[in-house]
Amino acid sequence: METGTFKVKSGLAQMLKGGVIMDVTTPEQAKIAEEAGACAVMALERVPSDIRAAGGVARMADPTIIEKIMKVVSIPVMAKCRIGHFVEAQILESMGVDYIDESEVLTPADESFHVWKHDFKVPFVCGCRDLGEALRRIGEGAAMIRTKGEAGTGNIVEAVRHMRSVMGSVRRVQSMSADELSAYAKEINAPLELVLELHKTGKLPVVNFAAGGVATPADAALMMQLGADGVFVGSGIFKSSDPAAMAKAVVKAVTHYKDAKVLAEISKGLGDAMPGLDIKQIEPDKLISRRGW
């Protein structure tokens, strides 16, 4: 089988469907995530809330940290590169990471272009706020899409906004007549062939995860009920008062997202969730979700 084709890469991402991907900064955290049932881990130097607090320029993690995490877990390991920084992506691919997240959580390296992901054999995940952004990233070769949300806030409101926007637009495309599709593709600045495919199949050609602000099992279940294929949890696990318990509860919430009784049971006794931020109190130029185009 030919490796590195879009079909192969998007197929690999499909294997994560129904799972939880957790941000980790140490091998110990990676083991906690794996034991809790995470389907993959995201290897980082700092979780998004710490990146937000520190300010300055956030770059790809030290390869040593990523390698240490890769050695201790058997589940897939993801790592982040900056938007447009194809050399960071080349480095991560050479290290053998399983997926690369071209992430707005890091400081963008290019304000005009994202990484051309078709040049890589490793699958990429990218964030989006709406259908146009999702289809532009898929057109560049992204094998997996996620909401941007507002990372590091513990506030789910932006992830909800982005998921509702994408899913609402998917339904809108389904209801369009064929002669409307070209104009709509132009309106949302998306590749026409992907809009046509969406109209035909009724769904995105790649998995669509929720990310950015997931802090509780209820948050995770909310995103699943809104149509997410799975959930990324960044600061929400290891900034909570009991990370191991929170990690297990979020995994169960994604599995049993429609069962309110199970959700009530697993939400008991978890201690404090991560401290949250009110999105309205963040200055517009400090909003991470606005990075990317």
From Swiss-Prot:
GO biological process, one term: pyridoxal phosphate biosynthetic process
Reaction catalysis annotation: aldehydo-D-ribose 5-phosphate + D-glyceraldehyde 3-phosphate + L-glutamine = pyridoxal 5'-phosphate + L-glutamate + phosphate + 3 H2O + H(+)
Pathway(s) it belongs to: Cofactor biosynthesis; pyridoxal 5'-phosphate biosynthesis
Binding sites annotated in the UniProt record for D-ribose 5-phosphate: D23, G152, G213, G234, S235
Subunit architecture: In the presence of PdxT, forms a dodecamer of heterodimers.
Family, similarity comment: Belongs to the PdxS/SNZ family.
Protein name: Pyridoxal 5'-phosphate synthase subunit PdxS
Organism: Dehalococcoides mccartyi (strain ATCC BAA-2266 / KCTC 15142 / 195)
Organism lineage string: Bacteria, Bacillati, Chloroflexota, Dehalococcoidia, Dehalococcoidales
Gene name linked to the record: pdxS
